[in-house]
Amino acid sequence: MVQRVVVSKLLNSSRPLVFGMIHVPALPGTPSNTLPMSAILKKVRKEADVYFKNGVDGVIVENMHDVPYVKPPASPEIVSSMALASDQLVKSRDAHHPAALTGIQILAAANREALAVAYTTGMDFIRAEGFVYSHVADEGWIDGCAGGLLRYRSSLKAENIAIFTDIKKKHSAHSVTSDVSIHEMAKDAKFNCADGVIVTGSATGSAASLEEMIQVMKVQEFPVLIGSGINGKNAREFVKAHGFIVGSDFKIGGEWKNDLDSGRISKFMKHVNTLKR
């Protein structure tokens, strides 16, 4: 089996790798859109530059401002806009931190579209929803997609792109899988060829459960990332994780909707660089 670059880096790092979030401004056609694409892309590039200059290990672009979300497939203007945003991210990486990792998530659950964008823009991974098992989200019922998504990756010859999947994901109801533990779900994600899993709290900015992380990490040689609620105060508590995905804590006032705060990013990275897994 191919071990993708990002997977190798996560498993072999002496500390959790840090991935900063770029919450792309609301895109054309969505209710909150106010900016032209030129302004959206300028903001994406500016935030990417801030992240890479502060030494984060990777950056993820996500269309989080496109509320309310809709089920896949994503519409053409969303996919093309996210491709342009991803291109800005990759160009920033190449200019400031060539060794850094880049990823994408397209909401909601537009995993095939995210994979296509990652492939065409030269990114390293996608964050997927609904990879194994089903759940109920704000936008409705989300089906598991592992079989189709991995066949699509094979058809693109995009085996270099990793797929990290949320399990028991935030902003969702999981009563339909209440008899499946998060440990079992992680095992099934690995069995179905995910490259790693993401553990979150109940909502954006909410801390994950330490006990759930411990249970998931019993799956050997399988990256576990914490996908919400990480900050300078609790990073040490989750130090055994392979990666941190940080959005809210890197923003002014710790609010995900706000602009990036370079000082908060710098302070966090200095702290994380003292940690040892």
From Swiss-Prot:
Keywords attached to this entry: Mitochondrion, Transit peptide
A Pfam family assignment: BtpA
Cystine residue pairs: none
Localization (cell): Mitochondrion
Domain of life: Eukaryota
InterPro entries assigned to the protein according to its UniProt record, in alphabetical order: BtpA (IPR005137), RibuloseP-bd_barrel (IPR011060)
GO cellular component terms attached to this protein's record: mitochondrion
Main localisation: mitochondrion
Family the entry assigns: Belongs to the BtpA family.
PANTHER family associated with the record: SGC REGION PROTEIN SGCQ-RELATED (PTHR21381:SF3), ZGC:162297 (PTHR21381)
NCBIfam families, alphabetized: thylakoid_BtpA
Protein name: Uncharacterized protein F13E9.13, mitochondrial
Source organism per UniProt: Caenorhabditis elegans
